[in-house]
From Swiss-Prot:
Protein name as it appears in the record: 45 kDa cell wall protein
Location in the cell: Secreted, Cell wall
Keyword vocabulary terms for this entry: Cell wall, Secreted
This protein's GO CC annotations: extracellular region
Length: 13
């Protein structure tokens, strides 16, 4: 479930 967190942090701008 690390992919979900990566996406969330990658699309924060």
């Amino acid at each position: 479930q690390d992919a979900y967190r990566f996406l969330x942090t990658h699309t924060y701008g």
